[in-house]
């Protein structure tokens, strides 16, 4: 019975993460689009999500520092989860008192604070899920429930927010998001602290924490030693993400500009699109297991080029439901397919001694690429027609192919040289 309640708790915590994530990346940008703000401003607002990219910086601090009193009463992970969620709720209360459209500077600051505590919560919950499991099978189940919860949170934050905004208004949408977030502390108090085989070495003072930050330094050095072409990989990831991040960031301004209704966007783009994304992600994982990571990455990248291409076709044709459905199908399938494969590729780059930190570094850079590309895309979209913008997006994204081919050649050369030695 407890196991079932524990999994429900994991699902609810995942839902809260997905809801707050979607608040920054979809709900507020959509409201600003409705208020006729330009694409460069909407793109700039996405910079408020920077904490999602930089969470690797303070994750060692969360791992090492024990919160006085709460750390003893609740345990290390639960105390951090509770504190991060309380501050997240306070930030959302502050956000609720203001209209996002009235003062964009204040809106960006509040969203940045929300992103900080939401990403802090994610750090803690990721560690909790890993430490709480005792086998690979249980780990798979726990992360599956967490993923389902995250997607449900995104669905509530998109389809739910759109319909609620029509019926009740945007203020009620944010009240609803706050109400769901307030469930988080209750869930944390109901679940148990992980039982570790070895004693955790933590401190409740700031002395000696500098030593722990050596983990990040060693991880980066190890990363560089393992991958002599690290700069090429960084450039590759940036270009690889361009075919997905830019269309995703500019999708709502485009759809509204083409006169698609809120109902059509909610049902086709968010609800139907989410299901297609799950299908694409599943098939991407299967392909990587069947034919290997390198070939899968290439296939995923090429398929992903169809996404901005379809947006260009939609922008050229204009309002057309059939073309809209085809575009959403291709865009979400490609996003799920390539997203899963690039995550597997990140994992393959990690040294076994520093898997957690190195994967966090890779994930942070991936998030950073998405935010930078979204911001640059917003600036470019203001000065180009939609058709020309997405054509340039397609051509720019194609540059990943020669970069990836160079990485592949260097990898083969390194492997052959190692065998000779």
UniProtKB/Swiss-Prot annotation:
Keywords for this protein: Cell inner membrane, Cell membrane, Membrane, Transmembrane, Transmembrane helix, Transport
UniProt-annotated location(s): Cell inner membrane
InterPro entries: AmpG_permease/AT-1, MFS, MFS_dom, MFS_trans_sf
Chief place of localization: membrane
Record GO terms (molecular function): transmembrane transporter activity
Topology in membrane: Multi-pass membrane protein
Transmembrane region(s): 6-26, 41-61, 80-100, 104-124, 139-159, 166-186, 230-250, 274-294, 297-317, 324-344, 360-380, 388-408
One Pfam family linked to the record: MFS_1
Keyword Metal-binding: no
Similarity comment: Belongs to the major facilitator superfamily.
Name by which UniProt lists this protein: Putative transporter AmpG 3
Organism in which the protein naturally occurs: Rickettsia prowazekii (strain Madrid E)
């Amino acid at each position: 019975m407890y196991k079932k309640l524990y999994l429900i708790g994991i699902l609810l915590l995942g839902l809260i993460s997905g809801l707050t994530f979607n608040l920054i990346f979809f709900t507020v940008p959509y409201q600003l689009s409705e208020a006729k703000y330009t694409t460069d401003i909407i793109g700039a607002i996405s910079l408020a999500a920077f904490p999602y990219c930089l969470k690797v910086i303070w994750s060692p601090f969360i791992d090492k520092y024990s919160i006085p009193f709460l750390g003893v009463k609740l345990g290390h992970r639960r105390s951090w989860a509770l504190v991060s969620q309380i501050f997240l709720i306070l930030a959302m209360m502050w956000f609720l008192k203001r209209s996002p459209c009235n003062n964009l500077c204040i809106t960006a600051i509040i969203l940045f604070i929300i992103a900080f505590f939401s990403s802090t919560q994610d750090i803690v919950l990721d560690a909790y899920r890993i430490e709480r499991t005792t086998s690979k099978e249980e780990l798979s189940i726990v992360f599956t429930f967490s993923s389902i919860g995250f997607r449900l949170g995104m669905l509530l934050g998109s389809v739910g927010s759109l319909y609620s905004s029509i019926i009740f208004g945007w203020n009620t949408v944010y009240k609803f998001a706050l109400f769901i977030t307030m469930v988080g502390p209750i869930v944390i108090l109901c679940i148990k602290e992980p039982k570790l085989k070895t004693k955790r070495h933590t401190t409740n003072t700031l002395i000696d924490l500098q030593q722990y930050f050596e983990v990040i330094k060693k991880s980066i050095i190890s990363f560089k030693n393992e991958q002599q072409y690290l700069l090429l990989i960084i450039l590759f990831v940036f270009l690889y993400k361009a075919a997905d991040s830019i269309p995703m960031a500019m999708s709502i301004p485009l759809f509204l500009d083409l006169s698609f209704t809120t109902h059509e966007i909610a049902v086709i783009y968010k609800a139907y699109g989410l299901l297609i994304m799950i299908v694409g992600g599943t098939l991407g994982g299967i392909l990587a297991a069947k034919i290997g990571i390198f070939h899968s990455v290439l296939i995923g990248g090429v398929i992903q080029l169809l996404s901005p291409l379809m947006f260009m076709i939609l922008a050229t044709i204009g309002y057309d439901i059939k073309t809209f459905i085809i575009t959403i199908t291709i865009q979400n399938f490609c996003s799920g397919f390539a997203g899963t494969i690039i995550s597997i590729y990140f994992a393959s780059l990690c040294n076994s001694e520093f898997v957690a930190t190195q994967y966090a570094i890779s994930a942070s850079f991936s998030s950073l690429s998405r935010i930078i590309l979204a911001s640059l895309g917003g600036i470019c979209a203001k000065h180009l027609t939609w058709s020309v913008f997405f054509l340039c997006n397609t051509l720019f994204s194609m540059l990943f192919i020669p970069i990836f081919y160079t990485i592949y050649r260097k990898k083969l050369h390194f492997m052959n040289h190692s065998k000779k030695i």
